[in-house]
Amino acid sequence: MAFRHITKEDLTSRLEDPQLFIIDLRSNWENSTLKIRRARRETPEDTNLWLADYPKKSEIVLYCSSPGEKDSLRIAEILSAAGFENVSVLSGGWAVWETAGLPMEKRISDPLSKGVVPNVGKP
């Protein structure tokens, strides 16, 4: 199935659209510092666990760093089969966005993902 591709220019112009969900499919080490502004990190291997978090009628833009947007296209296929109607893939993925210096933000680190366990309940 062919999915719509969205250009970096089109995505930039829509970054503040509250109906738009931008999903970062890169691996943890790839997205450890920066991501596209407003993007949410989702694990491709756990797609069936997180797809219910998104309204099926909303617009979803996927991006990754795999050659030819391979990971984004694979997840777009899964979302489409699950009834999502408006799924796009960022043309050129993360590399195009980063090279162009478009709006990015620092990823909020999760202490548990780095093996740091907070001292809960200890003095």
Regions found by a protein language model. Name each.
Residues M1-E16, L20-F21, N28-V61, S66-P123:
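Rhodanese-like catalytic fold shared by cysteine-dependent sulfurtransferases
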